[in-house]
């Protein structure tokens, strides 16, 4: 049967047309009128991507703006992008932005504002930057994009070198962006949203300066400024940046293979067969394998969401080192090497996808033996993207099971009867399709382990619904 993981919220729309701003009663801030007012010149984003049952195909990326950046949109040359990070940065927002912009061909520099390249992002995720912000001061960029998270946003705000760089960039007409807390905490504090329409994380809306028109759109574009709400809107945000840099055709091209959600902000579902109760005697213990070449977004989304739900997640590297380089060159630091992590017992073992990451998993005898032991014990296991086909199917771990995988890998599955579903649960197995389904995959796991209300709570907290 088809089981709705999250209910539909009628008030949330893919197209959010906002009316003319009006003053609040106390005169402290301009806010936009209700979404129902259709006669608006407001620039905002509509990103409906639809999955074709046979081949992933993205619908058109529609972006309206108060003013265009035609020079940036028309140039085919590689664009240079700076993404600063700090301790406490929201990892989904940082990594999703970097991943998608690199898919578009941008030269993205992840720069630490800390003293070291390694930053301890939120939810226990450890990232390694490409350089220090202090070493980027003489460089010019086509885009500077600020991830959110706290205290990461406050640290970005307090970095004098970064402030000088961004202000100079904006004064020179550069494209700039921020998501989550960063529009209010960083750009607002620096006076870079004055007179503009902007959005941010819901609990920070009141922290936007009075001279900013606060919008509740998932992604807001006003001239050269692009803002967004949170981790659950990060993919939409990043694709808006691709369109601003390279144009609509490139944004559509990048979106197609990612298996995007049909309607952003609304319900999602999983196909569940042979329903089984997923329960743990204590806090669920989850093993997430990583290797060089795993898919950046998938890996980070799974870890982040499950830790938000209060599961204990161990990130284990099957490589000889803790640090791995993901498929889009994000550098992540695992919690343990495989040999140490494998000494523990787990309720659930998960594999992100990506290439050559899935191939590395498939060739790891120690990982395959652990998975087979897990399956034989009737414990829970799962995989996303290329891994269901390249790892689980290849090693007999889908025998008698219904599953899905990345659409280009469907033909490798012996049973393709459920492949069109974005998330499939069959007893103790869960599989999913790709980067654009990873949030749904993680939230489906949250519901199976913790219940529907917890899944709703986590989904709302990241502005996924």
Each predicted region: which residue ranges?
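Extended, subdomain-level signal for the structured scaffold at the beginning of enzyme domains
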Residues: 29-30, 34-172, 184-195, 205-216, ...
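Alpha/beta-hydrolase-fold catalytic nucleophile elbow
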Residues: 406
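Intrinsically disordered, low-complexity basic segments at termini and long loops, enriched
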Residues: 1-36
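Anionic-ligand binding patches
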Residues: 198, 403
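Short, thiol/selenol-centered motifs that function as redox-active sites or metal-ligating centers
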Residues: 179-183, 384-387
